[in-house]
Amino acid sequence: MTSALCSKPIAPHTLSDDLADLSYSNTMALACMADSVVTLTDEVQLDEFMAYYEQDTQHRKPLFVLSGGSNVLLPAKLNAIVLRPQMRGIQVTAQTDFHVDIEVMAGENWHDLVVHTVAQGWYGLENLALIPGLTGAAPIQNIGAYGVQLEDCLQYVRAYHLPSQTWHDLTAVDCEFGYRDSIFKRQPNTWLISRVGFRLHTDATKVLASYGDVQTVAQSYATQQGRTKPMPADVMHAIIEIRQQKLPDPKQLPNCGSFFQNPIVPQDQFATLQSSYPAIVGYPMPDAMTKVAAGWLIEQAGLKGGGIEPIFTHQQQALVLTNHAPYIATKQDVAAAQKYIIDTVYKKFAIQLSREPVWVNADGSIGYDEHVV
């Protein structure tokens, strides 16, 4: 792999025609070759690279920001310079009897961060355990699981605005978070996140364990430790256990986690569906809306374990698409399976599923049409 460390201004030869293999840098294990990869281990390196990039008109190509590769669908050939933020570090910036503020660099593994904070007695992220990827990518999707979203604990994001070559500190409000959405997702390849600030609490009795099977499993962990009620560590271990049972390890069976978003429909539409399918799974949402479990829809459409070779839904969790031809399958294989699943679900339930992972075009731009190549 061609990997340029920007400890000094980038020399032209590091942006040559030597291709970089990204097949092993995306958890879906899709075959992908890129023009060049630049690995950034601190913010100064980014400033230096951008100064060179601005001057080097001969080799200039589009920029594409790639974090842990856990939520992207890459093209077979990526005609772009790939920027990989790999800054590391965690530090406490403020602390009281009730909360602790921490700043986390973009290259920190997300799950490792969750485990670390719980071990330190800093709580709020435990429901987000075992979500793949790096911390810098978490705000892009406003990651969420088991009743918690990233925005619940996020204070700020420090990010580089690539078009203007300026640094910005964005508050949670500035990030314009929504369900699996943010300003970073809506403005792709515009921002490079270098660090994220969180405010976590220190009250070990404050837990959210009422979602799905979490309460039962967390209570089991608490009982084993001689406690009457679950603590945050119990919730974290419960969620890890549940996710490991339901979700395949990308290292063993390539996938990019939940492939489809849970659709949100009007309550009256959900009530109509419920009259025909009493077991349908839904969760009340604001503004008279209901969030429907996409995995349930896919399974009831007869697609659990189904798809189009070599991309299939997982046998234990229909929400996950898996790649049975790692490093060979392409984005077009995923597109075919995705269309088949979306069309089948719509035909049965009249609900349109939406893809969660980011669709990357050949020039590094982000596409929203599954037929874009």
From Swiss-Prot:
Q: What is its EC number?
A: 1.3.1.98
From which organism does this entry originate? Psychrobacter cryohalolentis (strain ATCC BAA-1226 / DSM 17306 / VKM B-2378 / K5)
Domain of life from the UniProt record: Bacteria
Output the PANTHER family linked to this UniProt entry.
UDP-N-ACETYLENOLPYRUVOYLGLUCOSAMINE REDUCTASE
HAMAP family with a match to the protein in the record = MurB
**Catalytic center at which residues?**
180, 258 (proton donor), 356
- Family, per entry: Belongs to the MurB family.
A biological process (GO) of this protein is: peptidoglycan biosynthetic process
The record's section on SUPFAM superfamilies has: FAD-binding/transporter-associated domain-like, Uridine diphospho-N-Acetylenolpyruvylglucosamine reductase, MurB, C-terminal domain
Where in or outside the cell it occurs: the entry states: Cytoplasm
Q: Which Pfam families match?
A: FAD_binding_4, MurB_C
The record's function comment reads:
Cell wall formation.
Q: What is its main location?
A: cytoplasm
Report the PROSITE patterns cross-referenced here.
FAD_PCMH (PS51387)
Task: Keyword check for Cell wall biogenesis/degradation, yes or no.
Answer: yes
List residues of the FAD-binding PCMH-type domain.
30-203
Q: What is this protein called?
A: UDP-N-acetylenolpyruvoylglucosamine reductase
Matches recorded under NCBIfam families:
murB, PRK00046.1
**Cofactor(s) for this UniProt protein:** FAD
